[in-house]
Amino acid sequence: MTDTTIQSFAAEMKMSVDQLIQWFSYIGILKTEIGIVTQREKEILFKYMNDNKSDISKKLILQRKTRSILSVSSVGGKNKKVQIEIRKKLTYVQSTLQETEFIDVKNKMVLDANREASSLIVRNNRLVNKKISNTLGPSSLTKISKKNHRYSELIEHKEKVIGKISRKFEDKSLQDSDETQLLKKKTKNCWDIELNNTNAISSNLGDSSSNSKLYCMPELLEKNNNQKLENERRNRSRVRTRYRNGGKLTKQHKRGNHHRLYEATSDEFGMEEELYIPNRVNKSKRKQSALVQVFNKPVQTITRDIIIGQTISVAELANKMSIKSSRVIKTMMQLGIIATINQIIDQDTAQLVAEEMGHNVILRRENELEELIMNDRDIDITSSDTTLANRAPIVTIMGHVDHGKTSLLDRIRSTKIASSEVGGITQSIGAYHVSTDNGMITFLDTPGHAAFTAMRARGVQITDIVVLVVAADDGVMPQTIEAIEHIKAANVPVVVAINKIDKSEANPERIKNDLNNHGLIPEEWGGDTQFIHVSATSGNGIDNLLDAILLQSDMLELKVVHHGMARAIVIESFLDKGRGPVVAVLVREGTLKCGDIILCGTEYGRVRAMRNEFGHEITSAGPSIPVELLGLSGSPASGESVIVVRNEKKAREVALYRQGKSREIKLARQKEPNIENIFSSIKNTSVVSELNLIVKSDTKGSSEAIRESLENLSTGGDVTIKILSSSIGGITETDVALAAASNAVIVGFNVRADPTARRIIEADQLDVRYYSVIYDLIDEVKQAVHGMLAPRYKHEIIGLAKVRNVFRSPKYGNVAGCMVVEGMIKRYKKIRVIRDNIVVHEGELESLRRFKDDVNEVRSGIECGIGIKNYKNIHSGDMIEVFDMVKISHV
């Protein structure tokens, strides 16, 4: 045989590698799983295994597994089932020659002890009887014989103890041959102790001839007392085990050795014994649960620190104070506040309740993180070290639609934006900056259409100077007046540009008079408003307008910080399919750079790229510079503030907090049910005409303007316009699915449907409308609303006749002889019978005759006979009113 690895040798020996390594460790050879086994090591292992083969064959091992399910009671009252597996392993070893000899010696010693004890008893009885017969009477002999009988029982008990000790060590001697000698010593020591006790008793009995009283040995009393204490300890352990096992005693405890012990006592006649039985557990008692909760009443009032935010519910407040909600409600009722368990209460009320119940209140500002991140900036205007520099003025161009605002801006920028706009009108805010000889100016072009009121209001809020454009041939119009109101509300200086001055019908003086009525007084009239005559077509007066703007900005002394973390404002935002959310912002202070972490309303992100108004890539932008940036998580609302922060993680937390607050505000705006709302809902249930719309637009501002305009088209209950969704971006599959489920019309403003959505639209034949001009969108929706309205009719009175007499006709029944007093009576028209100015019948005119001839109409001042269909209760003096149903158009 050659050297082999430990794995191959284990496979050859048909045992595991671990077992083989264990065998090698028995013979003092250490091996590992990757070791090599030599031929010499194999021979040593085989020899060792052959020597121990006889020992192995003398052992018999029995293994038994018992599986059961234990049901354990839980706190909630339900029982939990636990699977239990009990494994038993019994080993039987054949006795050796030495163990057999030990057993024989032990049996011989027991027999010798029994003979010696018997001889001691016989000898003691003889001596006692002889002594007593000489000194005592018959009654005393009887007592002594009883005591001797008790001593004999005690000796028998000691023999039983010796037998049990022997049996115990016999069982132990069968375990292993190596422990045989140790067991012999233990058995011999125990035997010596018991034998000494027996000899002491016998010697005491032998000395009884000199003493008439017998006393118990101290060792026996001490042993009995120890045994008594041991039994009490076992009883306590058994009780604890019962509770721990769910009220069930194990077999080991049930089969425990409950010995009957004799309690030795001493009296005046000698030693007496009483039978002592250990206390047992009362099995009739009800089994207690293994899991028992015990609540101890606090000895003193517990005061906690309660952290309260801006709002908190009653249940949450009770949870923070670790009390029941009913106690909180009771305390609130005592304070005069009625609330339910789920009602939201404000911070002041919660503080009052918590302090009333003895707790310390810590008020927490929910926007603390928001304030922290806003203040953690490197720009501090109040600091003396901050350097302020002039910035370009932000000028907003406002005015009525088609008054030439964008054309004027094109003339200033030398571009042609107006010609490229759809419909020739501006439908979003555009920001541009222009460099002049005297400095730079940033212009904001706002829409003039009535639907873009919110856009114009935002433009005024972020501007420094407003240029109000008024057409010289058109005059002051509604949007012009609205712009003046926005200017007054924002308290912004204004420069009036009277455009189209080169037209023949231009009348600047009339415009000055009209604006004077609205509070804009020209400088030549003693006011402070500059009026500049310009022409966007020819360019006349453009330089004068720029000089007026720069003069006004110099008077304002516009200064900001040019370096540091930037702050900007959102002008417009839209969703680009390739680039994601695109946000047009206007920098107000600092320098905005690529890579900055920004927070904008409920959105956050990192600036990935920036472009100017010409579409060129830039890396930074200073104050008063409009840019388009990429990198936000979503499209923010127009007018939101953009702030550069240091930590992106904190920016995300603030954005999520703002989203939650926005959701709470939307829920709070829902009106609580009252009588008026209930009647309004009952009224609306009868309305069957409802127009569901899904609005998709290119920019956020356009979406808001369209939504507001469409909601204003509702006709007061006859037709309800319900906007199910309003968002930016193209028409997607989700929008089409929503339209199909809700039977809605999809309105797309400067957007188109993607291929997947287009296929679904064609398959389901959904109604999708595309628009590029907001005029067309509003007009078509208005026509659709009017088409859904139920037709309206009004009663037009065409004639009035007075009944003078009533005749009986076999064909028509009662016929009224009438005189037409007003208008004309026509056949087959609707009529009303009026008696004492009260309508008693409304029906149809069935017969109209002039003398005996049927006629179609009878004019005023002519007598006629009128027959009314299905009505005979007509009296003389009644008035018959003839009317026609005329359809009226909706306004």
Swiss-Prot record:
**One matching Pfam family:** IF-2
Cellular location(s)? Cytoplasm
From the UniProt entry, list the residue stretches annotated as the region G4. Answer: 499-502
The alphabetized UniProt keywords are: Cytoplasm, GTP-binding, Initiation factor, Nucleotide-binding, Protein biosynthesis
Q: Which InterPro entries match?
A: DNA-bd_dom_put_sf, EF-G-like_DII, IF2_assoc_dom_bac, IF2_II, IF2_N, P-loop_NTPase, Small_GTP-bd, T_Tr_GTP-bd_dom
Q: Does the keyword GTP-binding apply?
A: yes
- The annotated region (G3) lies at 445-448
What are the boundaries of the region G1?
399-406
* Region feature (G5): 535-537
> Binding residues for GTP, per the UniProt record?
399-406, 445-449, 499-502
The GO terms this record gives for MF are:
GTP binding; GTPase activity; translation initiation factor activity
Q: Describe the location of the tr-type G domain by residue ranges.
A: 390-559
Give the start-end ranges of region G2.
424-428
Domain of life of the organism encoding this protein: Bacteria
> What are the record's GO terms for cellular component?
cytosol
Q: Which family does the UniProt entry place this protein in? A: Belongs to the TRAFAC class translation factor GTPase superfamily. Classic translation factor GTPase family. IF-2 subfamily.
Its function, per the record, reads:
One of the essential components for the initiation of protein synthesis. Protects formylmethionyl-tRNA from spontaneous hydrolysis and promotes its binding to the 30S ribosomal subunits. Also involved in the hydrolysis of GTP during the formation of the 70S ribosomal complex.
User: Which HAMAP family is this protein grouped with?
Assistant: IF_2_B
- What is the name of the protein in this document? Translation initiation factor IF-2
